[in-house]
Amino acid sequence: MTSSPVPVQTDLRPVLSRLAKGEHLNEEEAFAAFDLIMRGQATSSQIAALVMALRLRGETEAEMGGAVRALRSHMIPIKAPDGAIDVCGTGGDGAGTLNISTAVTFVVAGCGIPIAKHGNRALSSRSGAADVLTALGVQIDLGTERQEAILHDEHCAFLFAPHFHPALRHAAEARSQLGIRTLFNLIGPMGNPAGVKRQLTGVFDPIWAAPMARVLGELGTETCWIVHGLGLDELTLAGESQVTALENGSLRQFSVTPEEAGLPRAPLDTIQGGDADHNARVLQALLDGADGPYRDTVCLNAAAALIVAGQTGTLKEGVALARRSIDDGSALSALNRLRAATNAIP
């Protein structure tokens, strides 16, 4: 991924004209176009036209790489504890499940792994990470310095994207009005402001797994799993999931099944979610010890996160650690500590 200077883009219309002809942008051109968006120099109509043109024609790895670089160039960075990871998904899968990665956050934190959970409110679903955390009583509207302090003190924090990526406000109206997945869904998980070197990322379409892993590697990520499970941006209990792993500078692609982790299969409808309040109640019940497919799904994904974190080497061992985190109250304690820290008067 080149870091050569790029021309300053001052008007998105020439780019739109090229895309209308079916042309591709190279990485530097994509950087310039998205940099213009981040600087507030494109209208909502132009932004919507750009991301829809890319989606209809098919986004390229170079375009994704340039867009990620633009996103990162405008973010407010913080420093994470050593060994910190992120667990998130692109969204946009349209499945309407319970919040998986948010629950995984507390299970993994309960295992002693620092976790800088990066996320937003729902844009193309009913309940995003920010929505369910708010319903759980976690205060997300905190300054970046306060969140950095919480991350270091509690080893668990939610990095609310609008606070760390203020430039994305210029695209908010277009994204909300479109209400569908776009390139922004792909680049969001690659813009963790804490600069984590390890992450578990779910993707709405497995075609993007290898490109995302390569781009993350070029941006300094050491280990990541990009996962997709039968339409979900998560590992699933419903059948076989696809994984693209970046490890030691190399990509490895493989599939995993619930049986490999020692878990029973369960259909997708067993983890159907609702609004933020409903999903928060179910997540709280999970941390309080409730059993069932939701717990198993969370444990499966937590196991993957623990492998990425270097805590274990197999899914079966990871599931055992995840179950212990829930059963001994460590996961619940992680939520309670985060809730208390974010609501404390500084």
Swiss-Prot record:
Pathway entry: Amino-acid biosynthesis; L-tryptophan biosynthesis; L-tryptophan from chorismate: step 2/5
Q: Where does anthranilate 2 bind?
A: R175
Any single GO CC term annotated in Swiss-Prot or TrEMBL for this entry: cytosol
Molecular function, one GO term = magnesium ion binding
Q: What EC class is this?
A: transferase
Q: Does the keyword Cell cycle apply?
A: no
The Gene Ontology biological process terms listed for this entry are: L-tryptophan biosynthetic process
Ligand binding (5-phospho-alpha-D-ribose 1-diphosphate): 89, 92-93, 97, 99-102, 117-125, 129
Which cofactors does it use? Mg(2+)
Record key words, sorted: Amino-acid biosynthesis, Aromatic amino acid biosynthesis, Glycosyltransferase, Magnesium, Metal-binding, Transferase, Tryptophan biosynthesis
Q: Which domain of life is it from?
A: Bacteria
Pfam families given for it? Glycos_trans_3N (PF02885), Glycos_transf_3 (PF00591)
The UniProt annotation places anthranilate 1 binding at G89, N120
Q: How is the cofactor bound?
A: Binds 2 magnesium ions per monomer.
Q: What's the catalysed reaction?
A: N-(5-phospho-beta-D-ribosyl)anthranilate + diphosphate = 5-phospho-alpha-D-ribose 1-diphosphate + anthranilate
Q: So where does Mg(2+) 2 get bound?
A: D233, E234
EC no. given is: 2.4.2.18
* Bridged cysteine pairs (disulfide): none
* Self-association state and partner proteins as the record states: Homodimer.
Give the matching HAMAP family. TrpD (MF_00211)
Q: Which family is annotated?
A: Belongs to the anthranilate phosphoribosyltransferase family.
Its function, per the record, reads: Catalyzes the transfer of the phosphoribosyl group of 5-phosphorylribose-1-pyrophosphate (PRPP) to anthranilate to yield N-(5'-phosphoribosyl)-anthranilate (PRA).
Protein name (record): Anthranilate phosphoribosyltransferase
Which organism's genome codes for this protein? Granulibacter bethesdensis (strain ATCC BAA-1260 / CGDNIH1)
